[in-house]
A protein has these predicted regions:
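Glycine- and aromatic-enriched membrane alpha-helices
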Residues: 1-432
Protein backbone atom coordinates (compact mmCIF):
# COMPACT_ATOMS: atom_id res chain seq x y z
CA UNK A 1 0.00 0.00 0.00
CA UNK A 2 1.15 3.54 -0.74
CA UNK A 3 1.20 5.86 2.28
CA UNK A 4 1.14 9.64 2.38
CA UNK A 5 4.82 10.55 2.69
CA UNK A 6 4.10 13.93 4.24
CA UNK A 7 1.83 12.45 6.90
CA UNK A 8 4.30 9.68 7.68
CA UNK A 9 7.21 12.11 7.97
CA UNK A 10 5.24 14.38 10.28
CA UNK A 11 4.21 11.56 12.62
CA UNK A 12 7.80 10.31 12.83
CA UNK A 13 8.91 13.88 13.63
CA UNK A 14 6.09 14.34 16.13
CA UNK A 15 7.17 11.17 17.91
CA UNK A 16 10.68 12.59 18.13
CA UNK A 17 9.37 15.83 19.60
CA UNK A 18 7.38 13.93 22.22
CA UNK A 19 10.46 11.84 23.02
CA UNK A 20 12.34 15.10 23.62
CA UNK A 21 9.83 15.88 26.37
CA UNK A 22 11.16 12.98 28.47
CA UNK A 23 14.68 14.39 29.12
CA UNK A 24 13.12 17.86 29.15
CA UNK A 25 10.88 16.78 32.03
CA UNK A 26 13.93 15.50 33.90
CA UNK A 27 15.74 18.83 33.44
CA UNK A 28 12.67 20.83 34.46
CA UNK A 29 12.06 18.81 37.62
CA UNK A 30 15.69 18.39 38.66
CA UNK A 31 16.27 22.13 38.42
CA UNK A 32 13.31 22.84 40.69
CA UNK A 33 14.30 20.26 43.31
CA UNK A 34 17.02 20.55 45.91
CA UNK A 35 20.54 19.61 44.86
CA UNK A 36 20.61 16.47 46.99
CA UNK A 37 17.73 14.94 44.98
CA UNK A 38 18.62 15.94 41.41
CA UNK A 39 20.06 12.58 40.34
CA UNK A 40 17.06 10.69 41.73
CA UNK A 41 14.59 12.28 39.32
CA UNK A 42 16.89 11.61 36.36
CA UNK A 43 17.09 7.98 37.47
CA UNK A 44 13.32 7.68 37.81
CA UNK A 45 12.67 9.17 34.39
CA UNK A 46 15.44 7.32 32.56
CA UNK A 47 14.37 4.01 34.10
CA UNK A 48 10.76 4.78 33.23
CA UNK A 49 11.73 5.37 29.60
CA UNK A 50 12.98 1.82 29.28
CA UNK A 51 10.49 0.09 31.57
CA UNK A 52 7.34 1.72 30.20
CA UNK A 53 8.47 1.17 26.60
CA UNK A 54 8.78 -2.56 27.23
CA UNK A 55 5.37 -2.60 28.93
CA UNK A 56 3.90 -0.91 25.85
CA UNK A 57 5.46 -3.59 23.66
CA UNK A 58 4.30 -6.49 25.81
CA UNK A 59 0.66 -5.52 26.30
CA UNK A 60 0.18 -1.76 26.79
CA UNK A 61 -0.64 -0.87 23.19
CA UNK A 62 -2.95 -3.85 22.85
CA UNK A 63 -4.90 -3.01 26.02
CA UNK A 64 -5.18 0.64 24.97
CA UNK A 65 -5.86 0.34 21.24
CA UNK A 66 -6.58 -3.32 20.63
CA UNK A 67 -9.97 -4.53 19.37
CA UNK A 68 -12.64 -3.74 21.90
CA UNK A 69 -13.83 -6.26 24.45
CA UNK A 70 -15.96 -6.23 27.62
CA UNK A 71 -18.38 -3.62 26.22
CA UNK A 72 -15.80 -0.91 25.66
CA UNK A 73 -13.84 -1.51 28.85
CA UNK A 74 -10.45 -2.61 27.51
CA UNK A 75 -8.70 -3.79 24.37
CA UNK A 76 -7.88 -7.44 23.82
CA UNK A 77 -4.38 -8.89 23.37
CA UNK A 78 -4.38 -9.14 19.57
CA UNK A 79 -1.54 -6.59 19.42
CA UNK A 80 0.53 -7.97 22.33
CA UNK A 81 4.26 -8.08 21.49
CA UNK A 82 3.33 -5.82 18.54
CA UNK A 83 2.03 -8.83 16.66
CA UNK A 84 -0.56 -8.18 13.94
CA UNK A 85 0.76 -4.64 13.51
CA UNK A 86 1.55 -4.35 9.80
CA UNK A 87 4.61 -2.64 8.42
CA UNK A 88 3.01 -2.05 5.04
CA UNK A 89 -0.58 -1.45 6.11
CA UNK A 90 -2.25 1.21 8.25
CA UNK A 91 -4.24 0.71 11.41
CA UNK A 92 -7.82 1.94 11.50
CA UNK A 93 -6.80 4.88 13.70
CA UNK A 94 -4.67 6.50 10.98
CA UNK A 95 -5.23 5.45 7.38
CA UNK A 96 -2.41 7.39 5.71
CA UNK A 97 0.59 6.23 7.78
CA UNK A 98 2.16 2.83 8.55
CA UNK A 99 0.62 1.14 11.55
CA UNK A 100 3.95 1.00 13.36
CA UNK A 101 4.29 4.80 13.13
CA UNK A 102 1.04 5.20 15.06
CA UNK A 103 2.25 2.66 17.63
CA UNK A 104 5.55 4.51 18.10
CA UNK A 105 3.88 7.89 18.59
CA UNK A 106 1.48 6.47 21.16
CA UNK A 107 4.36 4.69 22.91
CA UNK A 108 6.26 7.86 23.74
CA UNK A 109 3.00 9.42 24.95
CA UNK A 110 2.42 6.37 27.17
CA UNK A 111 5.96 6.71 28.54
CA UNK A 112 5.82 10.39 29.43
CA UNK A 113 2.38 10.22 31.08
CA UNK A 114 3.20 8.16 34.22
CA UNK A 115 6.50 10.03 34.54
CA UNK A 116 4.57 13.23 35.23
CA UNK A 117 3.99 11.76 38.69
CA UNK A 118 7.70 12.00 39.50
CA UNK A 119 6.90 15.62 40.29
CA UNK A 120 4.67 14.75 43.24
CA UNK A 121 6.62 11.85 44.76
CA UNK A 122 9.95 13.66 44.53
CA UNK A 123 12.44 13.62 47.40
CA UNK A 124 10.77 10.88 49.46
CA UNK A 125 9.60 7.76 47.56
CA UNK A 126 11.66 4.55 47.58
CA UNK A 127 12.93 3.70 44.12
CA UNK A 128 11.73 0.10 44.37
CA UNK A 129 8.23 1.34 45.17
CA UNK A 130 8.42 3.84 42.32
CA UNK A 131 9.07 1.00 39.87
CA UNK A 132 5.99 -0.90 41.01
CA UNK A 133 3.89 2.27 41.19
CA UNK A 134 4.40 3.46 37.60
CA UNK A 135 3.80 -0.04 36.29
CA UNK A 136 0.57 -0.46 38.23
CA UNK A 137 -0.56 3.08 37.37
CA UNK A 138 -0.13 2.39 33.68
CA UNK A 139 -2.05 -0.89 33.84
CA UNK A 140 -4.94 0.20 36.02
CA UNK A 141 -5.33 3.88 35.11
CA UNK A 142 -3.66 4.97 31.87
CA UNK A 143 -4.36 1.98 29.62
CA UNK A 144 -8.08 1.80 30.52
CA UNK A 145 -8.60 5.56 30.12
CA UNK A 146 -6.76 5.58 26.80
CA UNK A 147 -9.00 2.79 25.56
CA UNK A 148 -12.20 4.36 26.89
CA UNK A 149 -11.62 7.60 24.97
CA UNK A 150 -9.07 7.00 22.20
CA UNK A 151 -9.54 3.29 21.59
CA UNK A 152 -13.26 3.45 20.84
CA UNK A 153 -14.31 2.51 24.37
CA UNK A 154 -17.43 3.39 26.29
CA UNK A 155 -16.62 7.06 26.94
CA UNK A 156 -15.95 7.67 23.26
CA UNK A 157 -19.26 6.00 22.46
CA UNK A 158 -20.94 8.50 24.81
CA UNK A 159 -19.41 11.45 22.95
CA UNK A 160 -16.50 12.39 25.22
CA UNK A 161 -13.82 14.24 23.23
CA UNK A 162 -10.13 14.64 24.07
CA UNK A 163 -7.88 15.63 21.19
CA UNK A 164 -4.45 15.05 22.73
CA UNK A 165 -4.82 14.05 26.37
CA UNK A 166 -6.38 16.66 28.64
CA UNK A 167 -8.55 13.97 30.24
CA UNK A 168 -6.62 10.79 29.52
CA UNK A 169 -3.27 12.22 30.63
CA UNK A 170 -3.45 15.44 32.60
CA UNK A 171 -6.70 15.23 34.56
CA UNK A 172 -5.90 11.67 35.62
CA UNK A 173 -2.28 12.53 36.52
CA UNK A 174 -3.27 15.68 38.39
CA UNK A 175 -5.85 13.91 40.52
CA UNK A 176 -3.44 11.03 41.05
CA UNK A 177 -0.96 13.58 42.36
CA UNK A 178 -3.33 14.66 45.12
CA UNK A 179 -3.86 11.07 46.23
CA UNK A 180 -0.13 10.33 46.08
CA UNK A 181 0.76 13.41 48.12
CA UNK A 182 -1.77 12.49 50.80
CA UNK A 183 -0.76 8.83 51.07
CA UNK A 184 2.97 9.59 50.97
CA UNK A 185 2.69 12.41 53.45
CA UNK A 186 4.64 15.64 53.59
CA UNK A 187 8.39 15.81 53.32
CA UNK A 188 10.04 16.01 56.74
CA UNK A 189 11.02 19.65 56.39
CA UNK A 190 7.96 20.79 54.43
CA UNK A 191 6.96 24.16 55.84
CA UNK A 192 9.77 25.11 58.22
CA UNK A 193 12.46 24.95 55.54
CA UNK A 194 12.45 27.03 52.38
CA UNK A 195 12.80 24.48 49.59
CA UNK A 196 14.38 26.67 46.94
CA UNK A 197 15.13 25.31 43.46
CA UNK A 198 18.80 24.43 43.18
CA UNK A 199 19.27 25.31 39.48
CA UNK A 200 16.70 27.60 37.90
CA UNK A 201 18.48 27.91 34.51
CA UNK A 202 18.29 24.11 34.05
CA UNK A 203 14.58 24.23 34.89
CA UNK A 204 14.00 27.03 32.36
CA UNK A 205 15.89 25.08 29.69
CA UNK A 206 13.77 22.02 30.44
CA UNK A 207 10.59 24.08 30.25
CA UNK A 208 11.61 25.52 26.88
CA UNK A 209 12.24 22.01 25.52
CA UNK A 210 8.87 20.89 26.89
CA UNK A 211 7.22 23.81 25.08
CA UNK A 212 8.90 22.73 21.84
CA UNK A 213 8.04 19.08 22.36
CA UNK A 214 4.42 19.94 23.02
CA UNK A 215 4.00 21.00 19.40
CA UNK A 216 4.54 17.36 18.45
CA UNK A 217 2.47 16.15 21.39
CA UNK A 218 -0.62 18.12 20.37
CA UNK A 219 -0.28 18.52 16.61
CA UNK A 220 0.84 14.92 16.25
CA UNK A 221 -2.66 13.94 17.33
CA UNK A 222 -3.91 15.28 14.00
CA UNK A 223 -2.18 12.18 12.57
CA UNK A 224 -1.57 14.06 9.33
CA UNK A 225 0.01 17.18 7.91
CA UNK A 226 -2.17 20.07 6.81
CA UNK A 227 -4.25 22.90 8.20
CA UNK A 228 -5.37 21.12 11.36
CA UNK A 229 -1.83 20.31 12.49
CA UNK A 230 -0.68 23.85 11.64
CA UNK A 231 -3.55 25.43 13.57
CA UNK A 232 -2.94 23.12 16.52
CA UNK A 233 0.68 24.24 16.84
CA UNK A 234 -0.29 27.91 16.86
CA UNK A 235 -3.16 27.31 19.28
CA UNK A 236 -0.80 25.46 21.61
CA UNK A 237 1.78 28.23 21.52
CA UNK A 238 -0.67 31.08 22.13
CA UNK A 239 -2.42 29.38 25.05
CA UNK A 240 0.92 28.72 26.72
CA UNK A 241 2.07 32.29 26.20
CA UNK A 242 -1.14 33.66 27.72
CA UNK A 243 -0.98 31.39 30.77
CA UNK A 244 2.70 32.20 31.36
CA UNK A 245 1.95 35.92 31.44
CA UNK A 246 -0.92 35.37 33.87
CA UNK A 247 1.29 33.42 36.28
CA UNK A 248 4.06 36.01 36.10
CA UNK A 249 1.57 38.81 36.71
CA UNK A 250 -0.15 37.08 39.62
CA UNK A 251 3.10 36.15 41.35
CA UNK A 252 4.45 39.66 40.78
CA UNK A 253 1.36 41.17 42.39
CA UNK A 254 1.45 38.68 45.25
CA UNK A 255 5.16 38.86 46.11
CA UNK A 256 6.26 42.15 44.64
CA UNK A 257 8.81 40.39 42.40
CA UNK A 258 8.42 38.90 38.90
CA UNK A 259 9.38 35.22 39.06
CA UNK A 260 10.80 33.11 36.25
CA UNK A 261 9.76 29.94 38.11
CA UNK A 262 6.18 31.19 38.03
CA UNK A 263 6.61 31.94 34.35
CA UNK A 264 7.70 28.43 33.42
CA UNK A 265 5.01 26.85 35.59
CA UNK A 266 2.43 29.08 33.93
CA UNK A 267 3.68 28.15 30.47
CA UNK A 268 3.43 24.48 31.39
CA UNK A 269 -0.09 24.99 32.74
CA UNK A 270 -1.09 26.59 29.44
CA UNK A 271 0.39 23.72 27.44
CA UNK A 272 -1.42 21.20 29.62
CA UNK A 273 -4.73 23.03 29.56
CA UNK A 274 -4.94 23.49 25.81
CA UNK A 275 -4.06 19.85 25.12
CA UNK A 276 -7.61 18.48 25.14
CA UNK A 277 -9.07 21.21 22.92
CA UNK A 278 -6.04 22.09 20.78
CA UNK A 279 -7.44 20.36 17.69
CA UNK A 280 -10.94 21.77 18.03
CA UNK A 281 -10.53 25.51 18.68
CA UNK A 282 -9.65 28.75 16.90
CA UNK A 283 -6.60 30.81 17.83
CA UNK A 284 -8.49 33.71 19.40
CA UNK A 285 -10.40 31.38 21.71
CA UNK A 286 -7.14 29.62 22.55
CA UNK A 287 -5.76 32.88 23.96
CA UNK A 288 -8.92 33.29 26.05
CA UNK A 289 -8.75 29.70 27.27
CA UNK A 290 -5.05 30.01 28.08
CA UNK A 291 -5.76 33.11 30.15
CA UNK A 292 -8.49 31.31 32.09
CA UNK A 293 -6.22 28.32 32.61
CA UNK A 294 -3.56 30.62 34.04
CA UNK A 295 -5.91 32.05 36.66
CA UNK A 296 -7.47 28.68 37.55
CA UNK A 297 -4.19 26.78 37.90
CA UNK A 298 -2.56 29.54 39.96
CA UNK A 299 -5.56 29.52 42.28
CA UNK A 300 -5.23 25.74 42.51
CA UNK A 301 -1.60 26.14 43.57
CA UNK A 302 -2.56 28.48 46.40
CA UNK A 303 -5.39 26.22 47.57
CA UNK A 304 -3.59 22.88 47.41
CA UNK A 305 -0.16 23.85 48.68
CA UNK A 306 -0.73 26.84 50.95
CA UNK A 307 -4.30 26.46 52.20
CA UNK A 308 -4.61 22.66 52.38
CA UNK A 309 -0.83 22.16 52.81
CA UNK A 310 -0.72 19.22 50.41
CA UNK A 311 2.94 18.55 49.70
CA UNK A 312 2.79 18.10 45.95
CA UNK A 313 6.49 18.78 45.41
CA UNK A 314 6.27 20.25 41.89
CA UNK A 315 2.57 21.16 41.80
CA UNK A 316 1.34 18.43 39.46
CA UNK A 317 -2.14 18.74 40.97
CA UNK A 318 -2.58 22.36 39.93
CA UNK A 319 -0.40 22.59 36.80
CA UNK A 320 -1.71 19.33 35.32
CA UNK A 321 -4.92 18.55 37.21
CA UNK A 322 -6.67 21.92 37.30
CA UNK A 323 -5.38 22.94 33.88
CA UNK A 324 -6.42 19.62 32.35
CA UNK A 325 -9.91 19.89 33.80
CA UNK A 326 -10.44 23.46 32.58
CA UNK A 327 -9.22 22.70 29.06
CA UNK A 328 -11.24 19.50 28.81
CA UNK A 329 -14.44 21.23 29.88
CA UNK A 330 -13.72 24.07 27.45
CA UNK A 331 -14.42 21.63 24.62
CA UNK A 332 -18.06 21.75 25.65
CA UNK A 333 -18.10 25.50 25.03
CA UNK A 334 -15.53 26.49 22.39
CA UNK A 335 -15.04 23.44 20.13
CA UNK A 336 -15.96 24.00 16.49
CA UNK A 337 -16.33 21.71 13.50
CA UNK A 338 -15.13 24.65 11.40
CA UNK A 339 -11.68 23.91 12.84
CA UNK A 340 -11.98 20.13 12.83
CA UNK A 341 -14.92 18.56 10.99
CA UNK A 342 -14.22 15.26 12.76
CA UNK A 343 -14.62 16.86 16.19
CA UNK A 344 -17.64 18.14 18.12
CA UNK A 345 -19.26 21.54 18.35
CA UNK A 346 -19.47 23.22 21.73
CA UNK A 347 -22.24 25.34 23.20
CA UNK A 348 -21.12 28.47 21.33
CA UNK A 349 -21.85 26.62 18.10
CA UNK A 350 -25.19 25.13 19.07
CA UNK A 351 -24.25 21.84 20.75
CA UNK A 352 -25.24 22.26 24.38
CA UNK A 353 -24.99 18.56 25.18
CA UNK A 354 -21.23 18.38 24.61
CA UNK A 355 -20.50 20.04 27.94
CA UNK A 356 -22.33 17.22 29.70
CA UNK A 357 -20.23 14.67 27.84
CA UNK A 358 -17.07 16.47 28.91
CA UNK A 359 -18.24 16.58 32.52
CA UNK A 360 -18.70 12.83 32.38
CA UNK A 361 -15.22 12.23 30.98
CA UNK A 362 -13.57 14.56 33.48
CA UNK A 363 -15.52 13.03 36.36
CA UNK A 364 -14.47 9.51 35.41
CA UNK A 365 -10.81 10.57 35.14
CA UNK A 366 -10.96 12.27 38.54
CA UNK A 367 -12.45 9.21 40.21
CA UNK A 368 -10.15 6.72 38.50
CA UNK A 369 -7.03 8.87 38.94
CA UNK A 370 -7.55 9.71 42.60
CA UNK A 371 -9.19 6.46 43.68
CA UNK A 372 -6.92 4.18 41.67
CA UNK A 373 -3.76 5.87 42.89
CA UNK A 374 -4.97 5.80 46.49
CA UNK A 375 -5.58 2.05 46.30
CA UNK A 376 -2.30 1.30 44.50
CA UNK A 377 -0.22 3.22 47.03
CA UNK A 378 -2.07 1.87 50.07
CA UNK A 379 -1.45 -1.69 48.89
CA UNK A 380 2.15 -0.88 48.03
CA UNK A 381 2.65 0.76 51.42
CA UNK A 382 1.46 -2.38 53.17
CA UNK A 383 3.60 -4.71 51.05
CA UNK A 384 6.84 -2.84 50.41
CA UNK A 385 6.64 0.53 52.12
CA UNK A 386 6.73 3.65 50.00
CA UNK A 387 8.95 6.17 51.79
CA UNK A 388 12.68 6.18 52.25
CA UNK A 389 14.03 6.27 55.79
CA UNK A 390 14.31 9.58 57.61
CA UNK A 391 18.09 9.35 57.34
CA UNK A 392 18.02 8.93 53.57
CA UNK A 393 15.48 11.72 53.19
CA UNK A 394 17.72 14.06 55.19
CA UNK A 395 20.90 13.35 53.21
CA UNK A 396 19.02 13.15 49.91
CA UNK A 397 17.97 10.38 47.57
CA UNK A 398 20.99 10.87 45.33
CA UNK A 399 23.46 9.46 47.84
CA UNK A 400 20.96 7.51 49.91
CA UNK A 401 19.29 5.58 47.08
CA UNK A 402 21.78 5.75 44.22
CA UNK A 403 25.22 6.49 45.74
CA UNK A 404 25.69 9.20 43.12
CA UNK A 405 25.81 12.98 43.16
CA UNK A 406 24.77 15.54 40.58
CA UNK A 407 27.77 17.71 41.45
CA UNK A 408 30.65 15.57 42.73
CA UNK A 409 33.52 17.00 44.78
CA UNK A 410 36.51 16.44 42.50
CA UNK A 411 38.99 16.24 45.38
CA UNK A 412 37.07 13.37 46.94
CA UNK A 413 36.18 11.63 43.70
CA UNK A 414 37.37 8.04 43.52
CA UNK A 415 37.19 5.32 40.89
CA UNK A 416 35.16 2.12 40.79
CA UNK A 417 34.35 0.41 44.08
CA UNK A 418 36.41 2.93 46.03
CA UNK A 419 34.25 5.75 44.68
CA UNK A 420 31.09 3.91 45.71
CA UNK A 421 32.40 3.31 49.24
CA UNK A 422 33.54 6.91 49.50
CA UNK A 423 30.08 8.16 48.67
CA UNK A 424 28.56 5.81 51.23
CA UNK A 425 30.90 7.19 53.88
CA UNK A 426 30.04 10.78 53.03
CA UNK A 427 26.34 9.93 53.09
CA UNK A 428 26.59 8.43 56.56
CA UNK A 429 25.29 5.08 55.32
CA UNK A 430 28.55 3.16 55.63
CA UNK A 431 28.90 0.84 58.59
CA UNK A 432 32.60 1.62 58.81
Amino acid sequence: MSFNEGDTTWIILAGGLVFLMIPALALFEAGLLRKKNAVSVFMQIFFGLGFLSIMWFLFGFSLSFGPDQANGFIGNLDYAFFKNIPLNEPLDYAKTIPGISFVQLQMVVAVVTPLLLTGVIAERMKFSSFVIFIGAWSIFIYYPLAHWIWGGGWLAQLGVADFAGGIVIHTSAGMSAIAAAIVLGRRRDFGPAIMVPHNIPIAVFGAALLWLGWFGFNAGSALATGALAANTITVTHMASAAAALVWIGLSWKRTGKPSVVSGINGALAGLVGITAISGFVSIEYAVLIGTGIGFASYAGLIIFKQKLRIDDALDVSSVHGISGIVGSLAIGIFASTMINPAGPNGALFGNFSQFGSQLLGVGVAIILGFGGTWIILKVLKAINGIRVSDKIEDIGLDLGEHAEEAYADEEEYKIGDKEYQNQKKRSGLSEE
